[in-house]
Every structure is written in structure tokens, then in C-alpha cells.
Regions:
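Helix-rich, typically C-terminal accessory recognition domains appended to large enzymatic cores
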Residues: 123, 346-384, 394-502, 622
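N-terminal catalytic cores of NTP/NDP-binding nucleotidyl/phosphoryl-transfer enzymes
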Residues: 2-78, 97-112, 117, 134, ...
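Cys/His-rich short segments
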Residues: 118-171, 175
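A glycine-rich helix N-cap at a beta->alpha junction
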Residues: 79-94
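Structured secondary-structure scaffolds
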Residues: 2-51, 103-107, 157-372, 414-418
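Beta-strand segments within the central parallel beta-sheet cores of soluble alpha/beta enzyme folds
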Residues: 290-293, 477-479, 589
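Phosphate-backbone binding interfaces of nucleic-acid-interacting proteins
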Residues: 536-665
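Intrinsic disorder at enzyme termini
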Residues: 473-564
Length: 665
């Protein structure tokens, strides 16, 4: 089919925030999107797959300052690292957009001006409760236990001149659209959440500019303002394919918009299903066809966090297991609408049972038997029976089931259907016992037919596997000397050419692993990382009183008894003075009042709090730690912090006012 005649399919991921190296939970989304994009190509669609990086905002400006570089230098490095991970995982994106791209920035300025000129944006003042890491204002009623509803950190009162978007103007229209298009927000649970928690109670006008930091896209007619994150970041989906609000959009935009699928994490679905469609309505641009809020990939029982020692990075996992194995783990373990769990133990189990045994051993055995009994030649002799017909039926049914699951974006279920093909093949070997047939010369045609059926089933399964594990698919097909079969031809069993020769040296696709050896290597790796952190603590970078920067790996340590825990003393401290540590990019030196004492404590939170912000705060302190020398200064305790999956820190503070020195129990 000619390229211009194909149906189009435009898929996007959320653009990754350029604040650091993405962990496997972040990487899951790009792998998921890649599997969908590849499958759509197999279905014959003209696919455009866009991903990229979100590179503006106060947090990046602060992190760049703490690192001693310009914001542009900081995001250049972060974007390169994110792109490296995406490429490592063999993702087939068509465009990697950066919000610092000149054409994107120019278009955002034009969009802002257009919305202002037509009265959708107006100038005013914003006074409310502000969360710096989330770069969001909230009302008192939106807080959860007095904290930011999105990240759980402290908010602080703020007032600033700002531009606002009239959200309420478009709310009735959006509600009507969602009701008329039930497929727009998926899964349905996300739709119900947006309707009941945000749209039906009523929308407030949205702040769309900031004046308290400069690292953003300037409002060209009022340059002391920079465009606020969501009006900048969300528009990448249209600017990346050539949208122009002046009416000069490119042919590419006209070809691919509206997007078929915005694939995003469940934590940002509000911005994509409320803010984004309303912006588009104001621009008179059609809405995307579907927004899918995928669940999180968790390590153990919680969201990944560096300070917990439970962050898994894609490149580390690739070193242990290989690219396709990691792709299999994250795609297979993620349910449709519930969080998935990943661990070293589970990955080794999947490696051994699914990849090495069910798939790898099947391919190796089949090729080896073809070489042993027929000098590598695979021929269909037509000596079939009832068991053969059942094999063929199951294989073709699983193809249909996998296809149906992919239409519903149930990728994990689709992979299960594919592996059911390989499971049925293994059962078929047990049923037909080729080694027994080989002993009887009269069963030679029967043996040949069995091996042909196995090879044909493997060819179908491997071709279907391509969207999820492309390298493995290609390796299998290369070993049986055939090309990838088109999805449209997988409704027929028996297309593998009779008389074809397979490789005489089958490659081991996946080697079995010993869980004990793997965990020992993991422990050694964590130990080396902790040692490196401790060594760094005495150097120019200093060290932190937070768990992350002290090299303390909470998840990696053995369980302790209650008596061990009881040895630690926690008290409320009040910070009465705070200064930046000279020549350190991370450290603040706080004088902390604890009862009648004042202690000096160093903390690696310079990127998140200014010395002025620290003064007066009540914090939680570990007070019976042995004093340590950090960056040439003595630290007499540890101020406790929490850390999110992006590596941002927030002080742990008592919910109610407590006197300095109060014991935490």
C-alpha cells in the first residue's frame, strides 16, 4: 500500500521533565508507547511517534544554579541522558521534541498572544498556596492534610502578578464532549475521577504565567512574565508536528492531527484531560481522540525513590538482563489499570521461566531436533492428526486474541496471549514426543510434520513478538531462516516454506540465572554506590543529611529488630540560622535548636530550599548520630527529608506546632 494511502496513527508520550536520569518507572512509558507504535505499523498504519523533554520551570532553574551551570547547559545534559536511555531501550520514536527548540518557543509565544487577544487570557494577581516542585497554586480546600495534593510536600503562601486563562468559559463544553465521547479518557476510572473531582464541582481560572523565575518562554508583549509550564509543555503535541496558530500549519500537522493517543502517567491525567482540551477548544483545534493514563510501575510496595534505595535504572537492568528482557519485564508486569510491581527476584523468575524456558528452550530444542533428524531441513509431509489441528487452532486463536487486546491497549494481556503460543508448542512437544518418533523409520514423515508445525508456530509467534521484543523476534526468525510475517497473513497456518533449512548452530536466546548470584551482585553494586557517595561526601560536593546524599540505602539493608530501631532518637528541631556551605553545590549549614541545645547540622537540600526559607522551620531530626565531618565541617545530626521519584526533596515537618526538643515516637 502506498504511504499516502495508509491510515495515520499519531501517538505521543508525556515529555519527560529534564531534571535528571529517568528510572525504569519513567522508562516504562516510552517502552509501552513503542510497543503500541510498532504494532500499529504492523497493522499497516502510517505511524508518527513523538516523545521528548520538558525543559523549563523554576525547579530546573534552581537545580542548574545548585550545579553551577546555566539552565540551558543543565537541560542539554539532561535531555541527552534521557534520549540515550530511550535509544538504549530500542524505542522507535519519529521525533524527539525539546521545549527549548526555537520553533516550539516561537509558537508558544504566538499561542499565548492569540489567546490573550481573543480574551481567553487576562492579567491579574494570584494569591494562594504554592508548591514549588510542582509549580502549582492550590486553594486551601484542594490540599490534602495541609500539603500539596499532587506530591505531598509543603505549600507556602504566595502572591504575584500573573496572566490567567478563563477555564470556566469552556468547562460546560468539555463536560458535554466527555459525555459524548466515552473513549476520550481511559481507563474509565480516570474519567470518573476527572468528572467528579474537578469538572462537576467547577473550574477556577488557571494561572498561565510566572514572574518569580526567568527560565521559561517569555510572554513577548510583557517580558517580565514567562509562560507557565502547562501552556508550554502541553502544546508540544501540536508544535512538534508543525502547528501554526496563524493558520499556516504544515502538511504534517494536517496529516496526523488529531492525535490518536496521548499516553501519559496517571498522575498528570488532569492536565491532559482538562487543561489541554480546553486550550485546544480555545484555539479551535480538534481534540485528541484518546488520553490513556497508565498506572505506575512500583519497586516492592512503593513508588521508586532514590532515598529508599529502590530505584532501578534501565541501563543497570540491561547490564544484568539485556534490552529485550527488560522490555518484557515492564510490559508483562503492568496491568491495564492497576499499578504493577517489579523486583530483582521477579525479574530473575521471569527470565528463567518465561524467557529461558518457555521461549528460549523451545526455539533451541526445535532447531536442534531439525538438525539432528533432518540435517536442518524443515518439511511439511502432511502427516497430521488431531493434536496437530488443535495446535493450529490455538495458534491462530491466540493471534486474534492478542490483536483484540492491543486494540484495547491491554499490552500485558496481549503478551500473555503471544506466550500462550509458545506454551502450546511446548505442550505439543510433550504430546508428540519427537524423540520417540525418531526411533521408528515408519514415523519419519510424522516426525517431519511435527517439526514443521513447531517451526511454523514459532515463526508466527516470533513475528507477533516483534512489537514488544524486536531484537529477540529478529534473532528467532533469522535462526529459522525466514522473514517477519505480516500481521494480515497470520490468519493462515502453514506459510513457512517447506524444504527450508534452519541454522545449524542455534543461539541461546536467554540464559538461566541464579537468583542468589544476582542478589549478591546487586548487593555489591549498592555497596559500591554507597562507598562512592561516602567518598564524595568529603570532597568538594560535600554531603547531605538526607538519606540520598549520605549514601544510606534503606531498601538494600537487612531488616532490623525493634530494639535496634529503638536505639535511634528523633526530636523536633527549630532552625534558627542557616547558611550555604562555601564551595558546595548541595549543602546548607543549619543551626538547629533542640531543647536547650543548638546543634550544627549539614543537609544536601540547597537545590530545594534557600537559607532564608529554612529559618524558622520545625523539622524532624535524628539526634543521637555520631558527629560526622562533611565538606570540612562537623554535622551533629540528620534532618529528615522525603524524596519523590524525580529526586526532589522536601523537609519532614510535624503536622501541628510542637516545641523544639519534643521527642518523636
Amino acid at each position: 500500500m502506498c504511504q499516502d494511502c495508509k491510515k495515520t496513527y499519531y501517538i505521543t508520550t508525556a515529555i519527560a521533565y529534564a531534571s535528571g536520569k529517568p528510572h525504569i518507572g519513567n522508562t516504562y512509558e516510552i517502552i509501552l508507547a513503542d510497543s503500541i507504535a510498532r504494532y500499529k505499523r504492523e497493522q499497516g498504519y502510517d505511524v508518527f511517534f513523538q516523545t521528548g523533554t520538558d525543559e523549563h520551570g523554576q525547579k530546573i532553574e534552581e537545580k542548574a544554579e545548585a550545579a553551577g551551570v546555566t539552565p540551558q547547559e543543565f537541560v542539554d545534559k539532561a535531555a541527552a541522558e534521557i534520549k540515550r536511555i530511550w535509544d538504549l531501550m530500542n524505542t522507535s520514536y519519529d521525533k524527539f521534541i525539546r521545549t527549548t527548540d526555537q520553533d516550539h518557543e516561537a509558537q508558544v509565544q504566538k499561542i499565548f498572544k492569540k489567546l490573550y487577544d481573543q480574551g481567553d487570557i487576562y492579567k491579574g494577581y494570584y494569591e494562594g498556596l504554592y508548591c514549588t516542585p510542582c509549580e502549582s497554586f492550590f486553594t486551601e480546600s484542594q490540599l490534602v492534610d495541609g500539603k500539596c495534593p499532587d506530591c505531598g510536600r509543603e505549600v507556602k503562601p504566595a502572591k504575584e502578578e500573573a496572566y490567567f486563562f478563563r477555564m470556566s468559559k469552556y468547562a460546560p463544553r468539555l463536560i458535554e464532549y466527555i459525555n459524548e465521547h466515552p473513549e476520550f479518557i481511559q481507563p474509565v476510572s480516570r474519567k470518573n475521577e476527572m468528572m467528579n473531582n474537578f469538572l462537576l464541582p467547577g473550574l477556577q481560572d488557571l494561572c498561565v504565567s510566572r514572574t518569580t523565575f526567568s527560565w521559561g518562554i517569555p510572554v513577548d508583549f510583557d517580558p517580565k512574565h514567562v509562560t507557565y509550564v502547562w501552556l508550554d509543555a502541553l502544546t508540544n503535541y501540536i508544535t512538534g508536528i508543525g502547528y501554526d496558530c496563524d493558520g499556516s500549519s504544515t502538511d504534517q500537522f494536517k496529516k496526523y492531527w488529531p492525535a490518536d493517543l496521548h499516553l501519559i502517567g496517571k498522575d498528570i491525567i488532569r492536565f491532559h484531560t482538562i487543561y489541554w482540551p480546553i486550550f485546544l477548544m480555545a484555539l479551535d483545534v480538534p481534540l485528541p481522540k484518546q488520553v490513556f493514563g497508565h498506572p505506575w510501575l512500583l519497586q516492592g510496595d512503593g513508588k521508586m525513590s532514590k532515598s529508599k534505595g529502590n530505584v532501578l535504572y534501565a541501563d543497570t537492568l540491561v547490564d544484568f538482563f539485556g534490552v529485550d528482557a527488560v522490555r518484557y519485564f515492564v510490559l508483562h508486569e503492568m496491568p491495564f489499570d492497576n499499578d504493577g510491581v517489579i523486583s530483582w527476584e521477579l525479574m530473575v523468575e521471569r527470565m528463567n521461566s518465561d524467557l529461558a524456558n518457555i521461549l528460549g528452550n523451545l526455539v533451541n530444542r526445535t532447531i536442534s531436533m531439525s538438525n539432528k533428524y533432518f540435517d536442518g531441513v524443515v518439511s511439511d509431509k502432511g502427516a497430521c492428526g488431531e493434536v496437530d489441528e488443535d495446535l493450529k487452532k490455538v495458534v491462530l486463536e491466540e493471534v486474534k486474541k492478542a490483536d483484540a487486546k492491543m486494540e484495547q491497549l491491554r499490552v500485558a494481556d496481549a503478551m500473555t496471549e503471544i506466550f500462550n503460543i509458545f506454551r502450546r508448542c511446548n505442550k505439543y512437544i510433550d504430546e508428540t514426543t519427537p524423540w520417540t518418533l525418531a526411533k521408528d523409520e515408519s514415523q519419519k514423515d510424522r516426525l517431519a510434520t511435527v517439526l514443521y508445525n513447531l517451526t511454523e508456530a514459532i515463526a508466527i509467534g516470533a513475528s507477533l513478538l516483534y512489537s514488544f521484543m524486536p531484537e529477540t523476534s529478529e534473532k528467532i526468525l533469522a535462526q529459522i531462516h525466514t522473514g517477519k510475517r505480516e500481521l494480515s497473513r497470520m490468519d493462515t497456518f502453514g506459510l513457512y516454506p517447506s524444504g527450508q533449512r534452519v541454522t545449524d548452530k542455534p543461539e541461546i536466546l536467554f540464559a538461566r540465572m541464579d537468583i542468589k548470584e544476582v542478589l549478591e551482585k546487586v548487593e555489591a553494586m549498592h555497596g559500591a554506590e554507597a562507598a562512592a557517595d561516602r567518598n564524595q561526601a568529603g570532597g568538594e560536593e560535600g554531603a547531605s543529611g538526607s538519606a540520598e546524599d549520605s549514601g544510606i540505602d534503606l531498601e538494600a539493608k537487612a531488616e532490623i529488630t525493634y530494639d535496634d530501631f529503638a536505639k535511634l532518637q528523633f526530636q523536633v528541631g527549630e532552625i534558627i540560622k542557616c547558611e550555604a556551605v562555601p564551595k558546595s553545590k548541595k549543602l546548607l549549614c543549619s543551626q538547629v535548636k533542640i531543647g536547650s541545645q543548638v546543634r550544627q547540622i549539614l543537609s544536601g537540600i540547597k537545590a530545594y530550599y534557600s537559607p532564608e526559607e529554612m529559618v524558622g522551620k520545625k523539622v524532624m531530626v535524628v539526634t543521637n548520630l555520631k558527629p560526622a565531618k562533611l565538606a570540612g565541617m562537623v554535622s551533629e545530626g540528620m534532618i529528615l527529608c522525603a524524596e519523590d521519584a524525580e529526586g526532589s526533596l522536601a523537609l519532614m515537618t510535624p503536622e501541628k506546632s510542637m516545641p523544639a526538643g519534643a521527642e518523636i515516637c
